[in-house]
Amino acid sequence: MSRENQKETNVIRTTLPSLSFVFPMYNEIGNVERCVAEALATGRKITSDLEIVLVDDASTDGCGALADQLAERHPEVKVMHHPKNRKLGGALRTGFAAATKDWVLYIDSDLPIEMDDALLAVPLTSNAEMVIGNRQGRAEGPKREIMSWVYNRLIRVLFGLNVRDVNFAFKLFRRSILERISLQSEGSFIDAELLIETHKAGFRIAELPLRYFERTAGVSTLGSGSVVVKILHEMADYRRAAALRPVRSAPAPPARP
């Protein structure tokens, strides 16, 4: 079966009752319109009850104003503005708190996937409360690949989380998970924290290989030295704090609507 036919079969076979897209944005004026257009097109294939949450993390390039214009045009879109830059973790926590639908799909605003590939994740929700992507076809150079391998290995050894691609910004999950976990990260450790907390609470995590595309607009800061240092500091802080917090186990998986 071709990939295109597989997508259409998934659409017919499985949908979601409702879905919130969450896009964290900092100086993404070159990507925001595409995010909304593609989320609307793909989201309508997944559900009839859709919202798109754009989190403007104190952008300086006009991204926030453009997001507001898109919200005026499309009732599915709502925009959250930070008066001060709070980095990825702060932006995602704001977006997750603003999401109101049964399922949440977090994707980076540089759109590292073909949006319709999200349809391939929907059938996996029959047996998992969270579906995460792992990148296929990465071409970021040996330095980034080594950093990624070391980071994933650290997370596995320190926290017992065995997934292939902790930091890939494709995570589809039940919003009810957020009621049972605690997220504190303000930086890029948020991806690992979300997965670790979900795993510790007993929820099921499925993995989906996804084609990866380099950004075509805007500037990534994930590989910068300051970001890496902040991730390591937040990891150490999290490990210390986690030892003091009780673990809340997951309820029985809900019946699928």
Feature roles, as predicted:
Residues 1-19, 158-161, 184-257:
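Hydrophobic helical membrane-anchoring modules
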Residues 16-19, 40-54, 62, 75-78:
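Short loop->beta transition adjacent to catalytic acidic/histidine clusters or analogous donor-positioning motifs
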Residues 28-43:
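Short, well-formed alpha-helical segments that are part of the catalytic scaffolds
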Residues 30-34, 61-70:
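Acidic helix N-cap motif at the loop->helix transition within catalytic regions
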Residues 35, 63, 92, 116-118, ...:
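Acidic donor-diphosphate engagement hotspot in glycosyltransferases and nucleotidyltransferases
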Residues 50, 64-98:
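Conserved donor nucleotide-binding strand/loop of the catalytic core
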Residues 56-65, 111:
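A conserved acidic beta->alpha catalytic loop
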Residues 82-98, 103-106, 115-188, 215-234, ...:
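Acceptor/aglycone-binding surface of glycosyltransferases and processive sugar-polymer synthases
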